[in-house]
């Protein structure tokens, strides 16, 4: 039986087309996702935590639109490089808060150089994980926070042409099948979304009781 429930509306805080594409896939049929208004400028992401940066982005949208806003922030954490990425992952090659993101290729090149300088060769020495935090800020002042994590390691060289960011370097563990050593950039969208930090975070959002038909969504 087809449900006639009206989907709750969220405004997406991200203007990154790669992220928006993934978010649309992950929330399809769960919410009505509106694009970020073009007139809203980029937010200076100067918080000390992923949650803090995500909140800054969501609140900027909420204050302009008056509608519930969803934002995410992602950090990569590399065991051999403590404190170097994390909240600064997207601007790793140019760590200025006013630069929300630096070119993907520059970030990947810096990471490979840093691990090479430390003579990290084995998968264990190149261990890393991603964390994505997703926040929904509501007009009534409430908020919902979920997260997702994906463990893996950094490949010795870029592989694959799909995805974005560090996808050509990150090998998730476990993969799709036993012994799978593919990077995210070598996987299909469905395979990546099943394993990735962002996929897990947004599935946690999509399955939250707040989005069920039996509960009232704060301010559609």
Task: Tell what function each PLM region has.
Residues 2-11, 17-220:
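Anionic-ligand binding patches
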């Amino acid at each position: 039986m087809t449900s006639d429930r009206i989907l709750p509306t969220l405004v997406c805080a991200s203007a990154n087309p790669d992220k928006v594409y993934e978010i649309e896939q992950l929330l399809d049929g769960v919410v009505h996702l509106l694009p970020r208004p073009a007139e809203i400028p980029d937010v200076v992401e100067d918080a000390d935590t992923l949650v803090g940066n995500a909140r800054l982005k969501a609140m900027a949208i909420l204050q302009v639109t008056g509608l519930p806003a969803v934002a995410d922030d992602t950090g990569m954490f590399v065991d051999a490089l403590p404190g170097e990425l994390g909240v600064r992952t997207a601007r790793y090659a140019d760590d200025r808060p006013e630069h929300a993101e630096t070119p993907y290729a520059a970030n990947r090149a810096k990471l490979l150089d840093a691990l090479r300088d430390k003579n990290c060769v084995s998968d264990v020495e190149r261990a890393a994980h991603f964390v994505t935090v997703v926040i929904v800020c509501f007009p009534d002042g409430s908020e919902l926070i979920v997260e997702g994590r994906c463990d893996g390691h950094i490949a010795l060289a870029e592989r694959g042409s799909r995805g974005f960011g560090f996808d050509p370097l990150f090998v998730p563990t476990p993969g799709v099948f036993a012994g799978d050593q593919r990077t995210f950039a070598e996987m299909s969208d469905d395979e990546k979304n099943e394993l990735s930090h962002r996929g897990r975070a947004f599935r946690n959002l999509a399955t939250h009781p707040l989005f069920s038909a039996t509960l009232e969504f704060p301010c559609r």
